[in-house]
Amino acid sequence: NCMVAQSGGPTAAINASLAGVISGIKKSGKYDTCYGAINGILGILNDHFLNLSEIMQENPDYRERRKTTPAMYLGSCRYKLPDYLDDDSPYVYIFKQFETYQIGAFFYIGGNDSMDTIKKLSDFAILTGQKQKFLGVPKTIDNDLALTDHTPGFGSAAKYIGASTKEVIRDAQGLTYKKSMITIMEVMGRNAGWLTGGFSSLFPNQAPV
């Protein structure tokens, strides 16, 4: 069997990534059942799962509908696993769950924190001789994951910011105040500037990057 979970902030693409993971699992023919952990890694710790294989059998259009479903179908969390050298109890329980549900592969869809979680689980598996496979599926509007060019979620967020900025510009142009005005827009992106840079590309002659 295998398991998939989502974590971090929702994007317009994260459920499409879920649909892609499920499609790949089905095409591989290697797994009997695909479970979904509710609210990320907390779903494993709290024994809260969905049997996605059963849901797909009952709803043939399930995967196609997920491609355009907003928010996060499996729910999210912001829980960070401790370093296993400091406290390995969550890891021991998680791998006990994997054994109970006969999990051979775990897919985690998310951003930097989620990739940190999947790496910790992989490292612990290697350290303790476990055989499960761990795969991180990138998702972040920040576009700041290593070894990626455009992360799923970045494009839709950049498009939204560009459209919103143009609307603000039109509002400012339509005002008849005699005094000039300055509008400041704050854009998300943590320590990365990709979203701001993506917006700036709309005005190459006016917005120095």
Indicate where each model-derived feature is located.
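N-terminal phosphate-binding or glycine-rich loops at protein starts, especially the Walker A/P-loop
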Residues: 1-49
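Short glycine-rich or small-residue beta-strand-to-loop segments that form or flank ligand, phosphate
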Residues: 1-11, 72-78, 104-110, 136, ...
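Short glycine/serine/threonine-rich phosphate/pyrophosphate-binding segments
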Residues: 11-21, 44-45, 82, 89-92, ...
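Structured loop/turn residues at beta-strand edges in well-structured enzyme cores
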Residues: 29, 101, 130
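Accessory alpha-helical/coil subdomains and C-terminal extensions
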Residues: 34, 97, 105-110, 116-131, ...
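Glycine-rich oxoanion-binding loops at beta->alpha junctions
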Residues: 47-104, 113, 141, 152-154, ...
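Proline/glycine-rich low-complexity loops and linkers
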Residues: 137, 141-148
